[in-house]
Amino acid sequence: MNASCTLQLFANGAWCDVGSVSLLGPEAQGWRSKTYTGYSVEWAIEHGGARDAHAFACRFPVGLQAFEHPHWPVFLIDMLPQGFGREELLRRLGLSVTAGESVDWRLLLAGAGNSVGNLRVKEAASWLAANAGPLRGFTDDEVAERGDDFAEYLASHGLFVAGSSGVQGEWPKILLTRAEDGLLYLDHTLEDARAREHYIVKFGRGSNEALASILRHEAAYMALARMLGLRV
């Protein structure tokens, strides 16, 4: 397996190859493996010194100097699939859902292609595109009611993407995007030019009333965050 991955940033309306991360330690060590991170020469010359959205992170200023760490860079760890999405992606890859850190690199190369934000792993984006399935839109009611067509489509083409979206954790959740036709699509299947609104959709877990209550109250906290000036 490739011991390096290409990092892409979304800038000026397009995904740009801006640098890479290479393993210097054993892949089996997972995120604890030593790494070498650097920007491409072209990107470093064009955006030298930047710590804004043109950088991997604010503590990784753009430049020609490389970064060596005793583990993965933190921004890369943040893109590693976790929780429910990790389990679904492991199944998709034919691996045990209890697999530990030794499969972290394989998960990254398949599961960091549709992260929230402007940073992604190019190899993971390519893997996701090859496994995306047919483009299909759904009405709000079909999503809310979890109709048969939506549930079947999601099981075949969507749940494993939860691990690559950055909306991770133990709750089943996915990213949906509304297109110009008013329908909702799995975010990774819709081209950027058609996107109008973006949503995080979280599903309930079984018939546990306590968990259902937690889910219902999240809307109130979102409204409170909006009142406080947060963009939610």
For every predicted segment, state its role.
Residues 1-232:
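Phosphate/dinucleotide-binding and metal-coordinating scaffold of catalytic cores
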